[in-house]
Amino acid sequence: MLLATTPIIEGKRITTYYGIVSGETIIGANVFRDFFASIRDIVGGRSGSYEEVLREAKDTALKEMSEQARQMGANAVIGVDLDYETVGGSGSMLMVTASGTAVFLE
């Protein structure tokens, strides 16, 4: 499954547009991991443990979107967009959404 943020793929022809596809995942804050991440990762200016969780959430959302496109008969998703939004009463969870247009390329 080809995923692209662009509306076209150079050298390929779109023969079928299947429609909008999306995938979502929500990750919750872990108090203990947050505490240890702040101690361990602040020194370098980046939080490696947070980055890994975000990467996994992004990959899960993209995988769900790709599977939805595959079930429609598509072999690519164009115009892919990733959105990150805090949800929950105190913003304690993060929702990652991937969306795009499922197409068939030749």
Swiss-Prot record:
Pfam families the record matches: YbjQ_1 (PF01906)
InterPro entries reported for this sequence: UPF0145_dom_sf, UPF0145_YbjQ-like
Membrane-crossing residue ranges in chain numbering: none
Family assignment from sequence similarity: Belongs to the UPF0145 family.
Protein name (record): UPF0145 protein BF0226
Organism of provenance: Bacteroides fragilis (strain ATCC 25285 / DSM 2151 / CCUG 4856 / JCM 11019 / LMG 10263 / NCTC 9343 / Onslow / VPI 2553 / EN-2)
